[in-house]
Curated annotation (Swiss-Prot):
Principal localisation: membrane
Bias kind Polar residues: ranges: 276-285
Covalent cross-link Glycyl lysine isopeptide (Lys-Gly) (interchain with G-Cter in ubiquitin), where: K314
Protein name (database record): Pheromone-regulated membrane protein 5
Biased composition (Basic and acidic residues): 250-261, 309-318
Taxonomic source organism: Saccharomyces cerevisiae (strain RM11-1a) (Baker's yeast)
Annotated Low complexity bias: 238-247
Amino acid sequence: MTVITIAKRGLPKLTTSTSSTTTASSSSTITSVASSSSSLPLLSNSTSSSIIPSITPPSRNGNPYILDSGDMPNGTVFIVVGGIAGVIFLAILLWWVITTYSSHRLTRSVQDYESKMFSTQHTQFYGDSPYMDYPAKENFQDQVHISESDISPGNKDESVKDALVSHTNNEKPFLSNFERPLSSLVSESNRNSLFISPTGDILYKTRLSKLYQESPRLLQKPVIMTSDNVSTNSLVSTISSSSASSLDNGNEKEVGEDIRKPAKIASSPSRKLLNSPESDGSVNRNHSKGNLLVVQSKRKPTPSTYLEHMLEGKEQDE
């Protein structure tokens, strides 16, 4: 069994002391002593305080050293300077956008113009040009076809000669795709590059040969109808008939075959009819009679001369 004993306590006593110092400090001490005796605990408390004066700015009235801002808000100078700088920056940005757009537009228009003017599709090797005033077909037919009423027996050779010249002049702009240049560097019209292809001219002539072989419609044009019950269906047959009348019977077959094979003559100019002794006599007779099919021998140019002609843009005669 546990016995609890409660001791009596007296009321505490409060002791107060006040002191003033330069530092503000406050401390309160309460001491309580519990003992079996009847003495009461003691409580001690100390308080310190200090006075700080307030700072008052000087008045602007009558003071020349203080700027009077008046009614303007604070930061007016910053706002003005920032606005001017912003306007200048926006003006520069707007000018850059306008000039860039105009330059791109001008460049695009110039490129389109150059692509249309200097593209290979508008050259003489690609058929009709959009800048021509008349179609190529009508020009070809008008200059090559000859009516019978305009031809008399006396000037038959002259008419055939005119037809041949007209056909040769109109043949070059209206060739098919076989006569297209191999490359812009190999083209005769391009003199901006020093590149010279040693095989470009040979391949170009080969394409010309294929043109004559695969496009006979350029040569098979009705030209005239003779009064001797002999119908001529093409320019080649007309030339053959006019030339055959002025040749001997022994040389008629040989000359006719050479006329009907222009590809071999164009592709290999060194193979002439003058290689055989029989053809020498026929050529002399043809030259004396004014025949159109006289094949004259010509010395082949030296390589240096050939290169000079190519650089100067001169056409090589076949």
